[in-house]
């Protein structure tokens, strides 16, 4: 059984990957997608979204990182995948699930679920282009506006050479609205001969256990649930290993929140850093009442030094 951290554009960047993997329980993580159009990208484009390539493709906690590509041109994706491997990517993941309209309009992500033959050709081209010891994997949704083609899409990926398939148990049109249709993950798992990971609407350990029961799949990829409850992967891993299952208290999260902010201040432009903190803190309000109070204090602030002072007060009060 494996527990993975999902790739989420504009959310799970290098900073959040670093912080979340240090909590524990995550077996591997994936970069935000690197968009491939009609040319070979320079190394700087890969290092921008996957700086861990310079550190053995691992986060500071030692968690392996995989590089995700998104596009619709099999040959161009293959060339860029091969180059990513030269830069140190240990696994190439292919995105067939992004629901963003801007991405879909440029023929990327979930819109490709309308074309299973092209999905097959993309995976096959990338599989041929990268060294045999490097796995090619894929992530899909159940379909564009209906799950009727889910099995054909999954078979296309597996037959093309995908070592496993992650299934976000919703269609593109569903977006992120509940429920996740875990019963369709079970159907996909029966249709292909490669491992299948379930993804979608797992916010708690109990959710994971229900997902496992309904889907028959034990491997899980956690997205918003893990961002909102950073100890979730650790809880699932403890359940798997027969260890102690405990909640992550706010006092344990605070040092990570502080480090997240310090990294954001150092690595992002001043106009972007506050938004990233508010984004994560806003998601933490789902789990932590303390996050609700802290979010209320900073939500209208855009000056980094002001936020520094407000955070320091909050951290001091919690100590």
Swiss-Prot record:
Its EC number is 1.3.1.-. Catalyzes the synthesis of 5,6-dihydrouridine (D), a modified base found in the D-loop of most tRNAs, via the reduction of the C5-C6 double bond in target uridines. Specifically modifies U16 in tRNAs. The record marks 35, 95, 176, 276, 278, 299 as: Interacts with tRNA. Keywords: Flavoprotein, FMN, NADP, Oxidoreductase, RNA-binding, tRNA processing, tRNA-binding. Gene3D superfamilies: Aldolase class I, Dihydrouridine synthase, C-terminal recognition domain. This is tRNA-dihydrouridine(16) synthase. The keyword RNA-binding applies. It catalyses: 5,6-dihydrouridine(16) in tRNA + NADP(+) = uridine(16) in tRNA + NADPH + H(+); 5,6-dihydrouridine(16) in tRNA + NAD(+) = uridine(16) in tRNA + NADH + H(+).
């Amino acid at each position: 059984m494996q527990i993975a951290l999902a790739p989420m554009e504009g959310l799970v960047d290098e900073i959040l990957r670093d912080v979340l993997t240090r909590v524990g329980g995550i077996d591997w993580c994936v970069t935000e997608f690197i968009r491939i159009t009609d040319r070979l990208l320079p190394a700087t484009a890969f290092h921008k979204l996957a700086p861990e390539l310079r550190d053995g493709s691992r986060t500071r906690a030692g968690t392996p990182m995989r590089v995700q590509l998104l596009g619709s041109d099999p040959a161009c994706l293959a060339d860029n995948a091969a180059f990513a491997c030269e830069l140190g990517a240990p696994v190439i993941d292919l995105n067939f699930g992004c629901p963003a309209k801007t991405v879909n309009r440029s023929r990327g992500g979930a819109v490709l679920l309308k074309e299973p033959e092209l999905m097959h050709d993309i995976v096959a081209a990338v599989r041929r282009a990268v060294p045999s010891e490097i796995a090619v994997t894929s992530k899909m949704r159940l379909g564009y506006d209906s799950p009727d083609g889910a099995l054909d899409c999954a078979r296309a990926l597996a037959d093309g050479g995908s070592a496993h398939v992650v299934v976000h148990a919703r269609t593109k049109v569903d977006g992120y609205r509940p429920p996740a249709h875990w019963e369709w993950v079970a159907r996909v798992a029966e249709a292909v001969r490669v491992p299948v990971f379930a993804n979608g609407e797992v916010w708690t350990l109990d959710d994971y256990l229900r997902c496992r029961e309904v889907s028959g799949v034990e491997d899980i990829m956690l997205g918003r649930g893990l961002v909102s409850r950073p100890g979730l992967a650790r809880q699932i891993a403890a359940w798997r290993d027969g260890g102690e299952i405990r909640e992550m208290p706010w006092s344990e999260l605070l040092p990570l929140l502080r480090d997240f902010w310090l990294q954001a201040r150092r690595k992002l432009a001043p106009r972007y850093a506050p938004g990233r903190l508010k984004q994560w803190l806003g998601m933490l309000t789902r789990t932590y009442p303390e996050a609700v109070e802290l979010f209320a204090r900073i939500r209208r602030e855009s000056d980094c030094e002001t936020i520094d002072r407000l955070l320091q007060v909050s951290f001091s009060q919690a100590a």
